[in-house]
Design a protein with these regions (language model features):
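Conserved class I S-adenosyl-L-methionine
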Residues: 79-90
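S-adenosyl-L-methionine
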Residues: 122-155
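Charged, low-complexity C-terminal accessory regions
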Residues: 217-274
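Conserved beta-strand signature within the Rossmann-like core of class I S-adenosyl-L-methionine
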Residues: 211-217
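Class I SAM-dependent methyltransferase Rossmann-like catalytic core
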Residues: 21-76
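Mobile active-site "lid"/loop adjacent to the S-adenosyl-L-methionine
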Residues: 170-198
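A short SAM/SAH-binding and catalytic strip from SAM-dependent methyltransferases
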Residues: 149-153, 160-180
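Conserved SAM-binding loop of SAM-dependent methyltransferases across substrates and taxa
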Residues: 89-101
Length: 274
């Protein structure tokens, strides 16, 4: 086989390998049936695949996130338990450092990919908790968009730090796609639900008596091949974040990830003490 034939077959083979890997991950990742039906496992597998394709582009964002979380942890006077919302993938969570600073680490999410499950098997101080942080997915799955205000862990005195790890802008993504497809929810209704979910999570974080660290996408920025911004869209359905914190950019979709002519950057805001 000459070099040109091998080059010509390489990309299809790589594509097929990725498809097989995603399919295997989907089939072997534990996920409660209601969340699987809504599309959460599919979304999580997709994010994991995008991370593998864009590991270098994501590196600075992940490091910024970890640094902020550790700064928040370092300011805690109590060192019992750290509760992390959105820990199913672990890419942005400085798990080893948190274990060195706290007695226990609770990783809370709807489902957990292999690295999180492996870490919990190896370290008994890690607890995986399957948690609907919105407290509303059961009703949303039935088409009822009246939200329930979450209260999980608010009365737990052992919680020394809460971290909300890049989930604020994601809370509405799967529910809205599901409701639009299953119940023909309108665009305006999706926007209203998105705003309600964002506000509910911010209120939930504000109800904790312990320190809270927040990392959240604030805006989606679309750029053309020259790097010029062509559009900027709120990632939080126009719900404003409080003043303060720090800001950085996440090169989530470099050129070629979506198409050859556009890239997508997320503007991220982080709060050491939300």
């Amino acid at each position: 086989m000459d070099g040109r034939v091998a080059l010509g077959t390489g990309l299809p083979c790589l594509y097929h390998y990725r498809m097989i890997r995603e399919c295997f991950t989907y089939l072997t990742t534990p996920c409660p049936a209601p969340y699987r039906r809504m599309g959460y496992l599919r979304e999580c597998v997709g994010i994991e695949s995008r991370y593998r394709r864009n590991r270098k582009a994501w590196a600075s964002h992940l490091e910024e996130s970890r640094t902020l979380m550790l700064e928040a942890a370092g300011q805690c006077t109590a060192r019992d338990t750290v509760l992390v919302f959105g820990a199913g993938l672990l890419h942005d969570i400085p798990l080893a450092d948190l274990l060195g600073m706290f007695r226990r680490v609770i990783l809370a999410d709807l489902l957990f990919m292999t690295p999180a499950r492996r870490a919990a098997r190896r370290e008994e101080r890690i607890e995986l908790v399957t948690l609907d942080v919105t407290a509303s997915l059961t009703s949303l799955a039935e088409g009822n968009t009246t939200l329930t205000q979450p209260t999980a862990y608010l009365d737990d005195p052992s919680i020394s730090l809460v971290i909300s790890a890049s989930i604020l802008s994601q809370l509405s993504v799967v529910p809205n796609l599901y409701l639009e497809k299953r119940f023909r929810q309108s665009e305006a209704e999706s926007e209203q639900l998105g705003q309600a979910l964002v506000r509910a999570h911010l209120n939930y974080l504000g109800a904790f008596e312990c320190p809270v660290a927040l990392v959240a996408d604030e805006a989606h920025i679309i750029r053309d091949r020259s790097g010029a911004e062509t559009a900027t869209v709120s990632a939080l359905h126009d719900v404003p974040l409080p003043a303060g914190g720090r800001s950085w950019d996440w090169d989530i979709c470099p050129l070629g990830e979506i198409d050859r002519d556009h890239s997508v950057m997320h503007r991220v805001r982080g709060f050491v003490g939300f």
